[in-house]
Design a protein with these regions (language model features):
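Function-dense linear segments that define catalytic or interfacial modules
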Residues: 97, 105-120, 221, 232, ...
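A conserved FAD-binding loop/helix module that cradles the flavin
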Residues: 1-20, 190, 229-261
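Short, small/polar residue-rich loop motifs at catalytic or cofactor-binding pockets
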Residues: 58-60, 197-199, 239
Length: 263
């Protein structure tokens, strides 16, 4: 399942520490779990990139997502976990934006130094065929033609969305749009993906930061800290928590080693 997601982690996160302890019978936990997140684009480098700074403003201005059939499929403003489960059912999904939503999206992304407007100009060029997939059309129909999406389905999705925005009522997915999408172009689309950073699994340690073997015994002289340790997050990654863990676990591991040296 994870092979169809886009990698967004550090280039150096290659699992070397796990390989180093293979001959020590080290116990590994949660190695079947991976940190995955929605709201992602693919950068020209091929790496996944979170788009949270951009989608927040875009959704407030009437942006929405459609799948490969041109249909909306979920509440785009829902929590990340539920949105990701819905995205997993699609072959592809695209964020559809009018000019205001597109401007808001780019403002959030450029203010976060993720890319520049010069990048956007390049990506929108008709002769650009790399990542990210970002397209522009004078009308929704023209935009759909560039994406090979059924225009009638996308236009129907837009009408249903705008009707709910005008009435300020929740749509079939439970979202009450804060604003309608403009009926006048241009319109923009960005292909969205699920990204993953790293495994949520790793080495099994005890309270003294010692690595355990498969018999749950401490391996003499072997300590671990940071992302190489498994089990901190359970089966769901909680955003930004690993920063604190990196500091705290490193501190505890160093203190544990110093205590042994001092004996």
């Amino acid at each position: 399942e994870y092979k169809k997601f886009v990698y967004a982690g550090h280039a150096g996160a290659t699992g070397d520490a796990i390989k180093m302890v293979e001959g020590l019978d080290a116990d590994l936990i949660n190695m079947d779990l991976v940190n995955t997140q929605p709201n992602s684009m693919i950068l020209p480098s091929g790496l996944g990139q979170y788009c949270n700074p951009g989608v927040a403003g875009a959704y407030k201005a009437g942006a929405y997502m459609v799948n490969q059939n041109g249909e909306r499929f979920f509440n785009e403003s829902a929590n990340a976990w539920d949105l990701m489960q819905a995205m997993k059912q699609n072959e592809a999904q695209y964020l559809i934006m009018d000019q205001t939503a597109f401007d808001n999206f780019n403002a959030g992304m450029t203010n976060s130094k993720i890319y520049t407007m010069e990048d956007v100009e390049k990506w929108l060029s008709d002769d650009y065929d790399g990542q990210p997939v970002m397209k522009q059309g004078a009308t929704l129909a023209e935009l759909c033609e560039k994406l090979n999406l059924p225009a009638d389905a996308v236009e129907a999705s837009a009408k249903a969305f705008n009707d709910c925005a005008a009435a300020q009522t929740a749509d079939a997915f439970g979202r009450t749009p804060a604003a309608a999408q403009s009926e006048e172009g241009p319109f923009y689309a960005l292909q969205m993906h699920i990204r993953y950073y790293a495994s949520l699994g790793g080495l099994h340690i005890n309270d003294s930061m010692q690595v355990l073997n498969t018999k749950q015994e401490a391996i003499p002289g072997l300590y671990a800290a940071g992302e190489v340790v498994g089990g901190l997050e359970g089966d769901v990654y909680m955003g930004a928590t690993l920063f604190g863990w990196a500091i705290a676990s490193g501190y505890d591991a160093a203190n544990a080693v110093n205590a042994v040296i001092a004996q």
